[in-house]
Amino acid sequence: MRIEILDQAAEDLIEGFWFYETQDAGLGSYFLTNLYADIESLRIYAGIHPKRYKEYYRLLSHRFPFAVFYKVLEDTVFIHAVLDCRRDPAWLRQRLI
């Protein structure tokens, strides 16, 4: 299974990196390492997560309050967004629709 991180999702990851990096030096790298591990798990587990917002699957991160929203087309997982779950649900919905 291939994984493709779309531009907006890559920007979400960078934004998350800088948020955590400003909290504590090195925490941003730890954030990225964990989120990429979560994303990598989709090679095996893509499609088993619950669907949310406009038919996106939602993978919850194991270490951080972030969710990975993705779609599966044939043998490719498309990562559309990586969002902070602490945000207003209306904002999350708006961002994904």
Label each region the model flagged:
Residues 63:
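Short His-centered aromatic/hydrophobic patch
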Residues 2-56, 73-76, 97:
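Basic, Lys/Arg-enriched alpha-helical interface segments
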